[in-house]
């Protein structure tokens, strides 16, 4: 009975602590990867109506599904469908269309279009030696010159109170890709 109780007690405690990259409180071990901030169009600020969680979800959903070489008609279809799905307003629709068109015309996405290895919504799980498991989903990752290029899309990247958290998130993505593939990585926070 005592042996059984010990096994039950041991089994009742989690063996690993799982955390997601977007909520990481610390940096990954090792050297940090280069993280750069890129912007689609700094001059085309959206209105106050096209901000917040719903707008971010709208843009992210479209960026997740849109072909990297989509034309305006294809982009509009996805924006319209997601606008209806999320109950977004006309201003959010207009701003999302502009954001997605801007992102797809950005040089980073042009580079991704020509990459032989390109992943979108790329899930990662990394076990750390300290009993933690890191999980994350990368918006866009591609290989260029034998190096991972990680792109994370943010509609609120200019929010200074979130910038450090976003950069930590990218550090964890880079760490995981380097651990899994043994290739160097760099990252971009793309303000859209």
Locations of regions flagged by a protein language model:
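Nuclease catalytic cores
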Residues: 1-148, 166-180, 184-186, 190
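Short beta-strand-loop-alpha-helix junction that forms the active-site gateway
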Residues: 144-146, 152-163
């Amino acid at each position: 009975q005592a042996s059984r109780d010990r096994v039950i007690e041991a089994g009742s405690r989690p063996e690993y602590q799982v955390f997601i990259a977007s909520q990481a409180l610390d940096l990954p071990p090792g050297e940090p990867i280069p993280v750069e901030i890129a912007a689609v169009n700094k001059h085309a600020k959206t209105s106050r109506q096209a901000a917040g969680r719903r707008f971010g979800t709208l843009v992210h959903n479209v960026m997740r599904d849109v072909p990297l070489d989509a034309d305006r008609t294809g982009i509009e279809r996805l924006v319209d469908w997601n606008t209806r799905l999320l109950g977004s307003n006309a201003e959010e629709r207009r701003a999302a269309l502009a954001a997605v068109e801007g992102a797809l015309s950005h040089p980073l996405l042009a580079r991704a279009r020509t990459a032989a290895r390109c992943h979108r919504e790329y899930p990662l799980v990394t076990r750390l030696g300290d009993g933690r498991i890191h999980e994350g989903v990368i918006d866009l990752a591609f290989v260029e010159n034998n190096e991972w290029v990680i792109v994370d899309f943010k509609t609120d990247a200019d929010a200074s109170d979130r910038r450090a958290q976003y950069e930590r998130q990218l550090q964890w993505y880079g760490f995981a890709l380097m651990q899994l593939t043994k290739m160097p990585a760099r990252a971009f926070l793309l303000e859209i």
